[in-house]
């Protein structure tokens, strides 16, 4: 494993380097590290990972590491099964192809190892003889076990791993079935029967897994037609391989799987598939020794081919019908009492097995030999078969000729066995057995005893032992009475008159009944003969009885005809209703299932979307973390590479292992490096000093000792040099003299060539001078052009450089200006945010203070209201003590207004129809309501002098006294509105409504009135309004609209009659503003009269008024102005 995490491309390069130096295991570890690290899982594309995967699998195949290949394949599947399925398919196919090539190469190598024999004359060596004696294997088997089997095992494991990898992946479904077919071919090629069984079990387990309901949408669904067809094709291939390997049990299991898939499919399988299915099924039944179902399968194949196949030739029809006919005739004769009939109460397995086999053929019940022969005749198979097989049917099933039966059948069998490849040759033995049984039955009806030799002569194709076995089987299975007399060499047939062993007539040709049949048929024959005799003697004996019964039947029919007809109609109606109910229930159930499936699909889709989103987020997060980690690792690696370049750095890195280096950062490693360098420098300096001392000492001693030797050497050297110089000088002089003579001779020889040289030189010089002049001229021209071109290019380049420089400066200036603007805008936004936050904080604080004040006022108002209720309750108690009619005697006196009550009868007579009780004050509720006993209970106004807020004597409650505090800052007593304009004078009484006494209901209050007792609307309780809200316009909360219209608005001061005065000044609020709370114009109107006084200040008036305000004529109310000069106009409804 490498010391640091490799990038994928670097890991591939390093793996190739390991392979080049012969270390494939190290290369595999390097590539394996790439797939083990999760950080590379979703970062790199398949173009980067796919070559690494191919190299990784190549090394796994080379080293036969199937488990490591499995790990890499699973990681690669998780990476690219939803991104690029094609890449995954290419990788898996490449992996299996490499494994197959290596296995084939190993097989060739194993075969070649046997051929490489040193001595062809002595093939059996002593070693091979001993090995064959010990293990029982030949040389080829031993070679395969050592060379081929490891690769076969590796290839088998590769197939299993790939199938396990792709078993539930819908994106790789085709690849899964291709690999399954390749695995079948592998088992067939290398004759691996045990592996074939394991493979079939594995595929069956996978089919069961995908048949279960899965919550993941990416899984394989068996309900899809494509999946069903792929599984069906794979099982057909499995069946074919099982038949070729003669694994009949596996073939039968494959047939069951195929039938289950065809049953599961909603559409009918293709005729070609069904034909192949019936063909293979017939073969399996024949190999299992079940001739009955074999013939049934061939009959189904014939029906399918005749109905579905187009352009069928007459030869093909004859061949198929002949095959069906001979297979049906080859069915052994059924037993009179089969084994499962004898033990029907205790053992039902044979019957259940037959029923299961019938289901595979699509039959309702198990077939029989007789039923198949009937179908053969019904489907016209006999007439379409070959003539010789038609004769065979006639001889075995129709004619009774025991003397010539075996001879005729033998001739047909000889015609069949002439050709070894004849498909009917497999039926010869079965036909012989059926023929022998037919012979025994026919002979038993003709002869009572027959010599064994004569019997053997009639059975042309049988031996004595085989014939004896047939006789025993006839006694055992067909319940015939046969006795073999070995002493007299004869056979005796049943002569005992015992009970019959068969409940039906014997099939096949018969001449007469056997003696054993007489017991059963004797009574029946006697009854038939007696009835015939009676009918002959007295034919009219029962005629009257029959006529009476006939008349009775007709009468009963006529009586019950209508009733029976109605019953039948009712039954039909019930049946139709039941059908409709069932259809409706089924339709509802299907709709419900469809909705559930849609909901499940929608949930799956949502879950898949959420999963994909989570995966994307996780992938992005990991990619970001990986990039950060990669940058850190790259910096760390660069630092370590720099340290490695020095010897000190290499020593430092050797001192630490991989884990320590991973824990350290670049600064720590650099510090360690500097420290190590310092130590090395000190050690090196100390070493140099000691070496200096040694060298100085030895150098001095050496020089002192070598002085005399050097002097002697110099003297000898001087003598030798002198002698050497003399010798060299003499030889030099001799060589110079000889060289001089040779040069003179050469000079004399070359002087003769001087004229020719001069001529050639002048000629050549003339030619070359012209060429040189032309080339020089062309060069000068090209030089001038190149100079001009370069000057032009230089001008353009300088101009473009100046332009680009100007553009860069402009762009830089623009960026600086934008940056300044952006910073300024950010600063302004920050200041604005701080200002808004401060304003919100101030507003929240004001709102909190106002809320606290409102709560305090509400608590105070609640207390005051409670006190008022208690005082009013006491006043009502005192009032009950008075006489009920005392108030009538005081109508002309000076009683206070609170006690003066009008006559109810007179008031009712003079009162016009008006809605003053519903539009004015609401009737009191709770304990404040007047009693219903006919005595009027007076009500009292607020003792604190507040005006009555409603008509009809409704008391002013404590919460109504706060109605004037609706203005902003309601706790200041209305001082903020004193300077505003007033609607009426300070001493004027409140404005009256025209027409009736409803105008005596007191002043119009802006905060609500006593009719609903909902309390005042307090403006001061609301949070302060912003400037932007004030600009929209304030809504009037008074009754100005009612005053202008003169109508009878029933909600004085309510919110329903506000007018929207957006964008304009506020309406005239003179009704409530100005003055203090006790000013004259703010006081409520009196309960009676027109002087506008208060009942507490009018004790001296002559006529007390009734609180209930009697109704006055409407004309009197509208004839003149009021005391305050205002004239109200009645709104006529």
Swiss-Prot record:
It is found in: Cytoplasm. Residues 895-909 have a biased composition (Low complexity). Residues 810-893, 920-944, 954-1081, 1097-1117 have a biased composition (Basic and acidic residues). Residues 810-1133 are annotated as: Disordered. One of its GO terms (biological process) is translation reinitiation. Keywords: Coiled coil, Cytoplasm, Initiation factor, Protein biosynthesis, RNA-binding. Residues 317-498 form the PCI domain. GO terms for molecular function: mRNA binding; translation initiation factor activity. RNA-binding component of the eukaryotic translation initiation factor 3 (eIF-3) complex, which is involved in protein synthesis of a specialized repertoire of mRNAs and, together with other initiation factors, stimulates binding of mRNA and methionyl-tRNAi to the 40S ribosome. The eIF-3 complex specifically targets and initiates translation of a subset of mRNAs involved in cell proliferation. This is Eukaryotic translation initiation factor 3 subunit A.
């Amino acid at each position: 494993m490498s010391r640091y995490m490799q990038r994928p491309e670097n890991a591939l390069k390093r793996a190739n380097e390991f392979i080049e130096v012969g270390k494939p295991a190290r290369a595999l570890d390097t590539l394996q590290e790439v797939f083990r690290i999760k950080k590379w899982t979703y970062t790199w594309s398949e173009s980067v990972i796919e070559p690494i995967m191919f190299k990784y699998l190549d090394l796994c195949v080379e080293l036969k590491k199937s488990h490591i290949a499995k790990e890499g394949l699973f990681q690669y599947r998780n990476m690219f099964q939803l991104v690029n399925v094609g890449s995954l398919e290419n990788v898996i196919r490449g992996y299996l192809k490499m494994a197959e090539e290596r296995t084939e190469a190993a097989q060739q190598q194993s075969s070649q190892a046997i051929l490489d024999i040193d001595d062809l004359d002595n093939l059996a060596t002593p070693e091979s003889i001993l090995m064959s004696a010990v293990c029982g294997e030949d040389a080829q088997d031993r070679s395969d076990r050592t060379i081929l089997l490891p690769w076969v095992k590796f290839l088998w494991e590769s197939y299993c791993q790939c199938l396990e990898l792709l078993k539930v992946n819908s994106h790789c479904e085709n690849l899964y079935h291709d690999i399954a077919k390749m695995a079948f071919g592998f088992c067939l090629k290398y004759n691996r029967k045990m592996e074939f069984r394991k493979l079939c079990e594995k595929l069956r387990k996978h089919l069961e897994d995908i048949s279960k309901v899965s919550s993941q949408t990416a899984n394989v669904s068996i309900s899809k037609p494509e999946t069903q067809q792929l599984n069906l094709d794979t099982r057909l291939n499995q069946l074919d391989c099982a038949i070729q390997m003669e694994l009949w049990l596996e073939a039968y299991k494959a047939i069951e799987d195929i039938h289950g898939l065809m049953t599961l499919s909603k559409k009918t399988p293709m005729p070609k598939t069904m034909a192949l299915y019936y063909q293979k099924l017939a073969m399996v039944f024949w190999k299992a020794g079940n001739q009955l179902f074999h013939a049934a399968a061939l009959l189904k194949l014939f029906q399918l081919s005749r109905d579905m196949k187009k352009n069928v030739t007459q030869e093909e029809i004859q061949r198929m019908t002949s095959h069906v006919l001979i297979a049906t005739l080859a069915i052994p004769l059924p037993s009179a009492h089969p084994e499962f009939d004898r033990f029907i109460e205790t053992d039902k397995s044979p019957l259940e097995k037959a029923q299961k086999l019938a289901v595979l053929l699509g039959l309702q019940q198990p077939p029989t030999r007789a039923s198949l022969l009937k179908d053969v005749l019904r489907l016209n198979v006999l007439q379409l078969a070959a003539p010789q097989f038609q004769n065979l049917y006639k001889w075995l099933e129709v004619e009774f000729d025991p003397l010539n039966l075996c001879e005729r059948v033998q001739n047909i069998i000889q015609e069949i066995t002439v050709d070894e490849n004849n498909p009917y040759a497999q039926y010869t033995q079965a036909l012989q057995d059926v023929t022998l049984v037919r012979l025994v039955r026919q002979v038993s009806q003709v002869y009572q005893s027959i010599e064994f030799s004569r019997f053997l002569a009639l059975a042309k194709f049988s031996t004595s032992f085989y014939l004896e076995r047939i006789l025993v089987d006839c006694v055992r299975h067909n319940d015939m009475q046969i006795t073999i007399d070995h002493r007299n060499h004869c056979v005796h047939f049943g002569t005992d008159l015992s009970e019959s062993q068969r409940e039906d007539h014997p099939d096949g040709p018969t001449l007469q009944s056997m003696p054993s049949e007489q017991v059963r048929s004797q009574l029946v024959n006697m009854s038939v003969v007696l009835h015939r005799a009676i009918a002959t003697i007295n034919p009219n004996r029962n005629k009257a009885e029959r006529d009476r019964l006939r008349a009775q039947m007709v009468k009963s029919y006529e009586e019950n005809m209508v009733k029976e007809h109605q019953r039948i109609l009712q039954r039909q109606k019930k049946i139709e209703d039941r059908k409709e109910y069932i259809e409706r229930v089924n339709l509802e159930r299907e709709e419900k299932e469809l909705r559930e499936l849609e909901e499940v699909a929608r949930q799956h889709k949502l879950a898949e979307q959420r999963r994909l989103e989570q995966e994307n987020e996780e992938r992005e997060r990991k990619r970001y973390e990986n990039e950060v980690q990669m940058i850190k690792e790259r910096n760390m690696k660069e630092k370590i590479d720099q340290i490695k370049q020095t010897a000190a750095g290499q020593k430092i890195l050797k001192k630490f292992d991989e884990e320590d280096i991973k824990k350290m950062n670049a600064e720590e490693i650099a510090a360690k490096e500097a420290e190590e360098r310092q130590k090395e420098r000190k050690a090196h300096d100390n070493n140099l000093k000691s070496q200096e001392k040694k060298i100085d000492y030895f150098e001095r001693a050496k020089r002192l000792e070598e002085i005399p030797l050097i002097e002697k050497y110099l003297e000898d050297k001087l003598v030798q040099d002198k002698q050497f110089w003399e010798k060299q000088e003499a030889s030099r002089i001799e060589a110079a003299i000889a060289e001089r003579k040779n040069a003179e001779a050469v000079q004399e020889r070359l002087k003769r060539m001087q004229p020719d040289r001069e001529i050639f030189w002048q000629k050549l010089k003339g030619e070359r001078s012209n060429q040189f002049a032309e080339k020089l001229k062309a060069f000068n021209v090209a030089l001038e052009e190149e100079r001009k071109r370069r000057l032009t290019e230089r001008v353009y380049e300088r101009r473009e450089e100046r332009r680009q420089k100007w553009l860069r400066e402009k762009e830089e200036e623009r960026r600086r200006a934008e940056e300044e603007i952006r910073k300024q805008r950010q600063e302004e936004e920050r200041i604005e945010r701080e200002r808004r936050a401060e304003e919100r904080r101030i507003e929240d604080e004001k709102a909190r203070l106002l809320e606290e004040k409102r709560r305090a006022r509400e608590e105070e108002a609640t207390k005051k209201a409670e006190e008022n209720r208690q005082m009013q309750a006491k006043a009502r108690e005192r009032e009950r003590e008075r006489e009920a009619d005392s108030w009538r005697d005081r109508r002309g006196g000076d009683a206070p207004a609170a006690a003066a009550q009008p006559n109810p009868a007179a008031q009712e007579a003079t009162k016009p129809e008006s809605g003053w009780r519903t539009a004015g004050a609401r009737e009191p509720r709770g304990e404040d309501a007047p009693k219903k006993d006919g005595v009027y209970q007076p009500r009292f106004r607020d003792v604190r002098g507040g005006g009555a807020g409603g008509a009809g004597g409704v008391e002013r409650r404590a919460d109504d006294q706060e109605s004037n505090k609706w203005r902003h800052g309601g706790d200041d007593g209305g001082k903020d509105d004193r300077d505003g304009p007033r609607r009426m004078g300070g001493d004027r009484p409140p404005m009256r409504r025209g027409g009736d006494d409803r105008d005596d209901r007191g002043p119009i209050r802006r905060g609500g009135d006593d009719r609903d007792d909902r309390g005042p609307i307090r403006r001061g309780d609301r949070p302060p309004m912003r400037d932007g809200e004030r600009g929209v316009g304030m809504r009037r909360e008074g009754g100005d609209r009612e005053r202008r219209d003169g109508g009878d608005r029933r909600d004085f001061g309510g919110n329903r009659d506000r007018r929207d005065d957006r964008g304009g000044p506020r309406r005239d609020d003179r009704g409530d503003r100005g003055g203090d709370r006790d000013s004259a114009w703010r006081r409520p109107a009196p309960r009676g009269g027109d002087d506008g006084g208060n009942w507490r200040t009018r004790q001296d008036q002559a006529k007390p008024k009734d609180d209930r305000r009697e109704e006055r004529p409407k004309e009197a109310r509208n004839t003149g102005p009021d005391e305050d000069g205002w004239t109200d106009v009645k709104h006529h409804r």
